[in-house]
């Protein structure tokens, strides 16, 4: 039926837009509709036991809000303030073709008697978000959010806006040409069928039809006419929701199907049972060791309790069975192989031991040795969104910030495509993630003290993994656990002793110890063996370690696990305490004697000092920065100085190079004494720090006014050699700041990105690079002050 006749029939019967049409007329109109688009299943939903992995084609927001159960996707969250729970269709996207499309599913209520709605969310991102970013849409409407085609518990079929940046939980009904309701849903099972039909002038009509699942008889429908093409592009999600600001309905879905040329199908976008793998190689000459972890999705581990690692070298067609490992807490299988042949490339795969099916594959490259420069990528501090998607109103922290569209790249950073692509273009040999792989309130609210805390943490972790899975699939990665990784804003680990009180500053780990142990399991199962694996209190594992890779000797240390709780009453210049703790201090003494003749690099979470200033250039007191306690910090700096090591770190959200001293400034100001630290910039963070010297500091480096000799408020001396300050000055920020913190959401006001450290054995120097996230290394410039070249002091010593 042509649109003009369809409209004529509708208005003749109802008389008014939005009026109900008679069932007999609805049937007549249905018979006159154009030929239906054929559909095919999006994904066969598991008929097994409940699991929070919904299958390769679906991504649930959040993990704990959905499960697959005996052939259905079931929403588990219908509480107040949990509107619009979504399950994104990862493998389906609305394209810009002027062609028909169709999406259908069987739906039903899990909570008869409650109120709410279900249906389809269409056009997330308006075709401007990468499919993974579009998959995060949930709760609140906002720019480029699309619209929803819905059935509510009263049987009303409607279309509701999901693109308004104001009153974001209103979900305003869109005026439509006609509809027929189907009465209360109750315990009925309904076929919900959404048709997208092209009409004149590049526009579309969208029909939502409710039918009997057995006979196919239509119960009712709604029509949204003359839909602009630009809002019918982007992501597609299933929706289950209570009414706004109420406890309410939870829905189930099954037999989800799609069809039509307006829907692109991308099976490669699916997420299988394995999210990814990470590995490390310790190529110490006595006994090379491979460690590899396979991160599974939240699967039913009674159906797949274990995984197998198989591998083969470049000259062998036969797969070798490495080991079987249980899929343990955090859905991780951990493997360790002693005597690894590090001189050959190997393919690896993760296999289901029961069926022999390969679940995930990658490459373990040979040790690059010292025949070519070793390239190290340095990341830290990364959030998936500029603002939490649970915030119903986005407010600027300062007037200079742009208004961020909720479902635009200004707010949805994930999956950080430019950042990752630009860093990977350097072809790093080793990836170092220096901590804060996720944060407690991004992309959603706190979940750390809820019964679903583990799943909530995994939701954040999976977003990090999904970002970097292809980077680390074929290259070794070192991951350091920092404070936000264990869901604390600050951490004074105090060897695990939390008896001082409930506050973070009382010391110890403040959240469920089993959750903390899971964090170390998911992030550290693949890292080199601990130097002394004796756990701290409560059985919390340690991860400080030594390894050799790329002709370089590495030490990993944990600079918060043993750190003393702050004593705010004591004199901050003379207070005594631990930073690394005696065990790690002894480790660094031992490391200084290991691997003679190799470059030495120490990997740690945070720079051991507090190079940060206020609006006038005065040092800021920050007990969280590892300037405290000063005596523990001084011992730590002296140990890496004695080892002639370069230190790579993150945490401070401020790209910086500094020479740190364990005592007074050297008499010869140009002498390369002290320990060299490179703290990479945040990859994407909300809290900002500055180091502004205003040209007033002695011994500036390269005539940069933001460099020179600096003594922090704890008496620690350092020479700052480069800084990547935010693009807005501290003074301008403070003049207009409306919050208690130093929050900036607009990336255009920040200096974020990644670091590259190159170990050039032949030239005998380190090359330190610091890149903006959006800079193309083939044509763009680094942050001011980089690159820097410094001698490999351990080679000079040998």
Where are these predicted regions, by residue range?
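Long, structured stretches of catalytic cores involved in phosphate-ester chemistry, encompassing
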Residues: 245-248, 257-259, 270-273, 285-287, ...
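Flexible glycan-contacting loops in extracellular carbohydrate-active proteins
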Residues: 218-249
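Carbohydrate-binding surfaces in secreted/extracellular proteins
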Residues: 105, 183-223
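Secretory/extracellular carbohydrate-interaction modules
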Residues: 77-167
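Short, aromatic/His-centered strand-loop micro-motif at the edge of beta-sheets
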Residues: 162-191
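Aromatic sugar-binding surface patches on proteins
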Residues: 327-336
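N-terminal export signals
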Residues: 5-30
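Low-complexity, Ser/Thr/Pro/Gly-rich disordered linker/stalk regions
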Residues: 32-101, 108-110
């Amino acid at each position: 039926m042509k649109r003009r006749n369809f409209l004529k029939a509708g208005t003749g019967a109802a008389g008014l837009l939005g009026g109900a049409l008679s069932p007999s007329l609805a049937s007549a109109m249905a018979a006159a509709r154009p030929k239906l688009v054929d559909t095919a299943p999006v994904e066969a939903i598991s008929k097994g036991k409940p699991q929070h992995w919904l299958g390769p084609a679906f991504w649930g927001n959040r993990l704990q809000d959905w499960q697959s159960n005996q052939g259905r996707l079931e929403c588990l969250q219908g509480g107040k303030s949990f509107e619009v729970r979504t399950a994104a269709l990862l493998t389906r996207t609305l394209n810009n073709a002027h062609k028909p499309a169709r999406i259908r599913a069987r739906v039903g209520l899990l909570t008869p008697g409650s109120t709410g709605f279900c249906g389809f969310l269409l056009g997330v991102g308006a075709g401007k978000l990468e499919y993974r970013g579009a998959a995060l849409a949930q709760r609140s409407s906002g720019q480029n959010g699309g619209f929803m085609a819905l059935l509510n518990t009263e049987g009303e079929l409607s279309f509701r806006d999901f693109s308004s940046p104001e009153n974001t939980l209103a979900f305003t009904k869109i005026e439509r040409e006609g509809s027929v309701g189907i009465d209360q849903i109750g315990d009925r099972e309904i076929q919900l069928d959404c048709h997208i039909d092209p009409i004149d002038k590049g526009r579309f009509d969208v029909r939502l039809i409710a039918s009997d699942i057995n006979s196919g008889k239509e119960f009712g429908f709604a029509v949204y006419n003359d839909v602009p093409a630009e809002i019918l592009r982007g992501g597609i999600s299933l929706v289950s929701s209570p009414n706004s600001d109420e406890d309410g309905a939870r829905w189930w879905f099954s037999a989800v199907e799609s069809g039509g040329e307006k829907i692109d199908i991308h099976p490669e976008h699916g997420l299988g049972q394995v999210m990814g793998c990470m590995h490390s190689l310790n190529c110490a000459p006595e006994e090379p060791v491979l460690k590899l972890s396979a991160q599974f999705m939240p699967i039913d581990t009674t159906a797949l309790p274990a995984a197998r690692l198989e591998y083969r070298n470049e000259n062998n067609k036969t797969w070798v069975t490495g080991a079987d490992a249980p899929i343990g807490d955090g859905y991780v299988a951990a493997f360790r192989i002693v005597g690894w042949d590090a001189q050959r490339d190997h393919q690896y795969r993760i296999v289901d031991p029961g069926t022999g099916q390969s679940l995930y594959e990658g490459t373990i490259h040979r040790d690059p040795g010292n025949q070519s420069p070793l390239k190290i990528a340095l990341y830290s501090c990364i959030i998936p969104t500029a603002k939490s998607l649970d915030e119903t109103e986005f407010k600027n922290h300062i007037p200079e910030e742009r208004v961020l569209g909720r479902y635009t790249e200004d707010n949805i950073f994930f999956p950080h495509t430019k950042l990752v692509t630009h860093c990977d273009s350097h072809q790093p040999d080793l990836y170092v993630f220096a901590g804060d792989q996720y944060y407690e309130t991004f992309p959603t609210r706190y979940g750390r003290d809820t019964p679903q805390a583990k799943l909530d943490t995994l939701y954040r972790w999976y977003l990090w993994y999904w970002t970097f899975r292809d980077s680390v699939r074929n290259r070794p990665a070192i991951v350091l656990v920092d404070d936000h990784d264990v869901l604390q804003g600050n951490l004074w680990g105090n060897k695990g002793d939390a008896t001082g009180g409930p506050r973070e500053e009382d010391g110890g780990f403040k959240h469920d110890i089993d959750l903390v142990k899971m964090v170390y399991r998911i992030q550290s199962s693949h890292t080199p063996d601990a130097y002394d694996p004796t756990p701290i209190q409560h059985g919390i594992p340690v991860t400080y370690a030594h390894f050799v890779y790329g002709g370089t000797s590495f030490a990993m240390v944990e600079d918060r696990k043993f750190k003393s709780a702050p004593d705010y009453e004591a004199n901050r210049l003379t207070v005594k305490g631990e930073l690394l703790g005696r065990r790690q201090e002894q480790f660094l003494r031992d490391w200084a004697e290991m691997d003679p003749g190799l470059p030495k690099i120490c990997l740690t979470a945070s720079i051991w000092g507090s190079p940060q200033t206020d609006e006038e250039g005065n040092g800021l007191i920050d007990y969280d920065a590892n300037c405290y306690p000063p005596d523990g910090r001084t011992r730590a700096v002296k140990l890496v100085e004695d080892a002639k090591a370069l230190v790579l770190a993150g945490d401070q959200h401020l790209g910086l190079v500094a020479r740190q001293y364990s005592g007074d400034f050297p008499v010869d100001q140009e002498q390369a004494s002290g320990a060299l630290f490179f703290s990479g910039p945040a990859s994407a963070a909300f809290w900002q720090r500055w180091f502004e010297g205003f040209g007033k500091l002695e011994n500036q480096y390269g005539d940069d006014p933001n460099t020179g000799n600096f003594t922090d408020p704890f008496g620690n001396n350092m020479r700052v050699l480069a800084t990547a300050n935010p693009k807005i000055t501290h003074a301008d920020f403070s003049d207009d700041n409306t919050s208690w913190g130093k929050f900036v959401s607009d990336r255009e006001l920040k200096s974020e990105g990644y670091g590259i450290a190159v170990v050039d054995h032949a030239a005998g120097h380190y090359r330190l690079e610091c890149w903006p996230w959006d800079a193309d290394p083939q044509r763009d410039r680094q942050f001011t002050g980089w690159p820097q070249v410094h001698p490999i002091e351990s080679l000079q010593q040998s």
